[in-house]
Structure formats: structure tokens, C-alpha cells
Amino acid sequence: MAHAPQIKIPATYIRGGTSKGVFFRLQDLPERAQVPGPARDALLLRVIGSPDPYAKQIDGMGGATSSTSKTVILSQSAKPDHDVDYLFGQVAIDKAFVDWSGNCGNLSAAVGSFAISSGLVEPSRIPRNGVATVRIWQVNIGKTIIAHVPITEGEVQETGDFELDGVTFPAAEVQLEFLDPAADEGEGGGAMFPTGNLVDDLEVPGVGTFKATLINAGIPTIFVNATDIGYAGTELQDAINGDAQALTRFEAIRAHGAVRMGLIEHVDQAAGRQHTPKVAFVAPPSTYTASSGKAVEAADIDLLVRALSMGKLHHAMMGTAAVAIGTAAAIPGTLVNLAAGGGERSAVRFGHPSGTLRVGAQASQVDGEWTVTKAIMSRSARVLMEGWVRVPGDSF
């Protein structure tokens, strides 16, 4: 029996924030994969090495965690006043499934630099030295992201002294602005607060009823108080990810929260929407030891946040969830805001398993409705490898 030979596709492997993924230009994909559909999904699954019953992604580029099982497709933007269209695919590890329902905030930090380096940004918009402003249209959620990319001698400056908890080595700082991050009316769960409330009573059969802030900003997120579900907010990955019953409870919270947010109609549909919504728990500041062994002092943070992604506690914090945290913290009365001490806030520094992160948001109330014009945070990005990725020619 003859076997199809491997084909090679231009690709770049990039770390963005505390995640990494395989980046493609749309024009470089095989023709069948240049349009959404089964062929594209099958190709990306094979590139990453999924589905893998061993959950290791040994036969692909994935790293067997939600932070490293990611793909990005970029193209010159068809949107006026934008430079690049950015499409993100979260690849399941043990299932044949690519989730297109949300963005990756961490990889957003790498979009601007990749767009510049791969010729997707007009040369006239790139200074010889200074900072390039890349206008990104995030296709998954229909929102604008502005990336401020440092440039030296006409090239992207990746090295620097900006340190990011969850990333071992320093790099150049990339500031990101997430414009109008809240959901638009009628889109995926409605407005910023889909239920119309800052805090709801969320009933989860078999788990309990507890207070929850259901917010759609950056990414749909369900925030609950750590103490209401038996946690302190200082937990590291092993405390959650090694507890199968805990993960089942969190998935139940996520599924019932998704129904309340209007993202799905029935809880059993949550399995087909793994990337969104996220579920997170918050607590007031407390001293703890991060996964690196570094002490995080209560006096250095405004609150504690732990968040789950793709069914596991995240090793640091998803960038889009950080947008949700910053947005919710800026609005008095949400659980996030109350955990941070309440009142009006333009920025918070929160503690996560790997350390701390500062995120800001500009919020205002108009006719009784809260709006957020932008959320701001800094990340870094670095190309790890570039060239081609190879897959069997009959795999998609």
C-alpha cells in the first residue's frame, strides 16, 4: 500500500506571553485549508499532534497543555483602518476538536511582531527605530487590539529586560490595548454583563449555589469567590489538576454559567465549547509561594485570582482572562472588584500561580450602564523557530 509523502508548510513557532503556538500566514496554507472547515481543522490537529489518547502530543508541535496547544492564522486585513486579521484556534489535546470561539490574549502579544516580520504590515507604518503600532482585527471575537511593537534598525526588537512572571527569561516589552473589550449586544452572550447583574446567584446542581460575576470582556468569564467553593485563592496547579473531583465540579460550574450567559442552551453543549467561557475564583490578598518558589507578598497585590483553561488550572493567567479581570475590577460591586477592596479602580495587580500581573481598564457608567473603552497590559513575545512544519499529505 502506497503512503502519501509529507508536505511542508511555512510556519513559525512563537512564544507570546505565557503561551506558545504555531503561526501561519493564510496564503501559505494549502488551498483546502485557506477556508474554514474540516480540512483546516484536520490540518491544524495534525500539526499540533491531536487527538492524542496519551495526552502528550509527542507526534506534533503541541506541548500537552492548554498554553501550548495553539495555532494562529494571519492575513492582511480586509477591515478598514486595520493592518492584520488574526484568527486563533485552540486545539484540544485528547479530542479531534479545534475551538474557534475565543481569542488568546497571550499570543496576541506575538501577532504584531509576526505580522511585521512576515510582510503583512505596510512598510510605511514601520519606523526605522521606535515603536510600531499594529492595528489587529481579532476575527474570532470581532474586536480591535493595538500592539505596540519595539523596532530597532527596521527590525522587530525581541530581546530586552521586561520580566513576565511565568516566563523564564526577560524580553522586550509589548504593550497591548484591547479596545472596547466587552461583548456587543446580541453577540455571544449579549452585553458585558449578559444577565444584567454585576453579581448573580449561580445554582449548580450537585455543587451548590453561590455568588458569581458573569462577564463578557476579553473572554466570557465566570468569577466566583474562592471561599465559596472551598479554596483560599493561593492554590497552585497540583492542588487542582491532581483532583479529578475538583475538575468535574469546575466543569459543572462552567457549563451552568455558560447557560446563564446565553453562550449555550443546554449544559451538555459545553463539551463542544471548551475554550469559552473561562471559570476563575478570586480572594483578597494573601501571601503565598509561587510555582517558581518566589514569595508573593500580600502587600504587593490587590487580589488573588486562579483561572482554569481547557479543563485545567492555568499555570499563570490567560491574557484574555486578564482583560476580564481588569475590566471587572474597574467596576464597583463585582466579585473581582470586592476582592480587591472595592471602590473605583483603574488598574489592579493580581497574584496568580506563577507570580503577579498588572492590568488596567478604563471604565465609565453612562445612563446606568457600565462601559469599558479599553483594557491595557504588557506582555512579551519571541520567535523560537521558523521554517516549515511537515505533515502527511493525506492528513487533511
Feature names for model-found ranges:
Residues M1-F396:
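A glycine-rich beta-to-alpha transition motif near the start of alpha/beta enzyme domains, typified by
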